[in-house]
Amino acid sequence: TGLNLNEVQKAQLVTDLAPFTVASITPVVVDPETLNIILNVSFKYDTNATSSTKEAIESLVSKTVTSFNNDNLKVFSSVFRHSQFTGLVDDADPSILSNITTVSLGSLYTPNTVGSYSFTINFGNALYNPHSGHNSASGGIIASTGFFVSGNTNEMFFDDDGVGNLRIYYLVSGVRTYFSSAAGTVDYATGLISVSPVFITTVSNVDGNISSAIRFTAIPSSTDIVGKRNQILEIDTLNTTISGNQDTIAVNSGGGSSTFTTTPSIASTSSY
C-alpha cells in the first residue's frame, strides 16, 4: 500500500489540483486507512483422495490466501467476497471437500502519548450484535492489544458490553477488572468506535514486536467486507490461521459420523 504523503507533499498536491477543481470546492488529501481482515480457515479433506500430507495441503491453501489478497484486495473500493474466497479454498486441492472461514476485522491506531485525547476507530462495516448485551460477560465483540494509561501501572485493554458502551479493563489473576465501563461508544450498525478522552502513555508489543500502535479488532455482522472511502482492505496473513482436518465421513464411506466435528461459523473475540 506504500507510504503516506507528508504535509508538504499534500499541500503541493492540492496546489497542483487547483486549476482543475470547481471554484466552490477545495480538495483535501487524506491518508489511506488499512482495514485488516483476519481469517480462520478450517477445511475438511478426504485422505483417500490424496497422497499429500495435511501440511502440504495447508500450504496450498496459504498460497490461495496470498493470491486472493494480491489479486482482489489492497486497492481502493475493493470487496472481500466471502463465497468467492471459500470457493477458491475448496478448489486449492481436489481432496478438499468443504471449509468454514470466519472473519474478524483489525485496525491499528497510534495514540498521542502526551495528553488526554479522544479518537475514533471506523471499521466501516456493521458489527455483530445479535441482541442487546451480547457476550457482555466475556468482553463483547471488541478487543484490543494492550496499553498503559497515566497514573496506573496495570496493562489495559478495550472491550464492549454489547449495548454500545466501550470499556477499559485490566486482568487480575485472569479476571477482567474494569478501569472504566464508559470509555466511549460502539455503533454496531456503522462500525464506528468513539473513544472518550484518555491519556495513553505507552502501548504494548503487537505481534511480538515493539509497537507505537494499538490494534483494535471486531467481529463483523457479515462475512462480506467492503472498503469504504479511504479504506484499503488487506488480509492480515500473519494472524490468519489455516487448519486442515480429516473428513471422517468421507474416509469411512459415510460411517464416520460419530467422530465428525463441526467448526463454528462466527469468529471468536480476540486481540491476536
What are the functions of these language-model segments?
Residues 1-72, 76:
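Carbohydrate-recognition loop of C-type lectin domains
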Residues 2-3, 47-51, 72, 91, ...:
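Short beta-strands and strand-coil junctions in structured, solvent-facing domains, enriched
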Residues 29-30, 55-140:
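An aromatic-glycine-centered, glycine-rich loop/turn in mixed alpha/beta architecture
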Residues 35-39, 99, 115-117, 210-214:
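Residues at beta-strand starts and edge strands
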Residues 45-47, 125, 218-222:
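Beta-strand elements of well-folded, non-transmembrane domains
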Residues 134-179:
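Structural flexibility/helix-modulation signal
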Residues 163-164, 171-272:
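Surface-exposed interaction regions enriched in Ser/Thr/Asp/Glu
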